[in-house]
Amino acid sequence: MLFVGEDPESTVVWGALDHDLNLDIPGFPRSDKVADIKWNRNKNKIARIKKDMPLHNEMDKYDMFTNGTLKIKTLMRNDSGLYEVEIYDSNGVNLLSKKFDLKIQGKSLTPKFLHLKTGAI
C-alpha cells in the first residue's frame, strides 16, 4: 500500500525521537572510483564529501563518514522526510542513488505499568 506523498523507490527507515540515527548505504561501491557523495533532504543539499576536498555540511545536525553513511544527531519530529544519497565517480558518472523515507517514532509520554495480582497467572 502506498500513501500520498510517498516515493515508491524509497526505503522506509524508522528513527527514535531524541536519538541519533545512521543512514547506511546498502550496496555502497567500496572502490577508489568514488569521488563525490551528496546527501539531500527533501531536495535540499545537507552534506557532501568530494575527493580531495573537506567535508561540507549545511548544518551541525549532520555528520557524514567516508563510507557515505549520514549521521543525523538528536532526531526531532521535523527531521522526518525524504533523504537521498547520490554517489559519483571522478567523471561525474552516477555509481549509485538511494532514497530513504525517514519516519520518527515518538516516546510515550506516560509510563505503562502492568500490575498482576498474586495467583492471577
Give the predicted meaning of each segment.
Residues 1-3, 19-58, 96:
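N-terminal V-set
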Residues 1-13:
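N-terminal Sec-dependent signal peptide, specifically the hydrophobic helical h-region
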Residues 3, 106-112:
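Proline-centered linker/hinge motifs at extracellular inter-domain junctions
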Residues 10-12, 20-22, 69, 97-99:
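Intrinsic-disorder/low-complexity, polar/charged segments enriched in Ser/Thr/Lys/Arg/Asp/Glu/Gln
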Residues 15-20, 118-119:
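Solvent-exposed, conformationally flexible loop/turn segments
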Residues 57-80, 89-91:
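Extracellular beta-strand/loop-rich beta-sandwich domains predominantly from IgSF
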Residues 82-108:
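Extracellular/luminal immunoglobulin-like beta-sandwich modules
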Residues 112-121:
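Extracellular regions of mammalian proteins, primarily the fibronectin type-III
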